Amino acid sequence: MLPFWIALQFLGSLPIRLPGMPRPEELGRSLLFYPLVGVVFGMLLLGFSALLSGTPLMLHAALVLSAWVLLSGGLHLDGLADSADAWLGGFGDRERTLQIMKDPRSGPIAVVTLVLVLLLKFAAILALIESHSSIGLLLAPVIGRAAMLGLFLGTPYVRSGGLGQALADHLPRGPGRKVLAATAIACVLLAGWSGVAVLLVCAVCFFWLRQLMMRRLGGCTGDTAGALLELLELAVLLTLALL
């Protein structure tokens, strides 16, 4: 179960302590447990939302979103911000885009992107709470993290060295595809036709975002993987809120 604990530590802010430095093979296998980490986060969000029952709706939605951000430690939002800055500031140039991604400072495009994504997430969560449809709080973390597995399965990693390279190089391809298939089936079983609609929308978003990465970078980075997760979580919530 060490790969699961690696995934849980890497993807969130829960107080997980590993017994030592993981081997590259264990890092690669940890990707297989990303959807399961999404299940853990989703169940925590569902439980927290249930505790807030009776709270004013806007406050309820704001607290759920705050808990969501705290669970992930803002890791993927940071990737989204870096990607937004790099995409507009890179002017279509691969090396300039990669260089801007490494800059820890956030420009105005990053701030605007984060505000818009969080605002849309808040509005979608509010709509789901109003309609007593909480399944999105489970599906969004699961699909977002499954998308990261899918990205590493079929997309070159363009930064040599580091954690991302170890993940990409040592990911078991066959089991990874089975995990993705099982995740998709579970989403449909849980949400029925709504789950089918969510998967279709997310598939379109996934392949479009992957195509953007391939055209600009020839692959993905940790930042673009985090951006993908955030945008697919948003796609899940918006799809369910609009159905």
From Swiss-Prot:
This is Adenosylcobinamide-GDP ribazoletransferase. GO terms for biological process: cobalamin biosynthetic process. PANTHER family: ADENOSYLCOBINAMIDE-GDP RIBAZOLETRANSFERASE (PTHR34148:SF1). Its main location: membrane. Keywords: Cell inner membrane, Cell membrane, Cobalamin biosynthesis, Magnesium, Membrane, Transferase, Transmembrane, Transmembrane helix. Pfam families: CobS. It is a multi-pass membrane protein. Pathway: Cofactor biosynthesis; adenosylcobalamin biosynthesis; adenosylcobalamin from cob(II)yrinate a,c-diamide: step 7/7. Its EC number is 2.7.8.26. One of its GO terms (cellular component) is plasma membrane. It is found in: Cell inner membrane. It comes from Pseudomonas savastanoi pv. phaseolicola (strain 1448A / Race 6) (Pseudomonas syringae pv. phaseolicola (strain 1448A / Race 6)). InterPro entries: CobS. The keyword Transmembrane helix applies. Belongs to the CobS family. The chain crosses the membrane at residues 31-51, 57-77, 109-129, 135-155, 188-208. Its cofactor is Mg(2+). GO terms for molecular function: adenosylcobinamide-GDP ribazoletransferase activity; cobalamin 5'-phosphate synthase activity. Joins adenosylcobinamide-GDP and alpha-ribazole to generate adenosylcobalamin (Ado-cobalamin). Also synthesizes adenosylcobalamin 5'-phosphate from adenosylcobinamide-GDP and alpha-ribazole 5'-phosphate. It catalyses: alpha-ribazole + adenosylcob(III)inamide-GDP = adenosylcob(III)alamin + GMP + H(+); alpha-ribazole 5'-phosphate + adenosylcob(III)inamide-GDP = adenosylcob(III)alamin 5'-phosphate + GMP + H(+). It comes from the Bacteria.
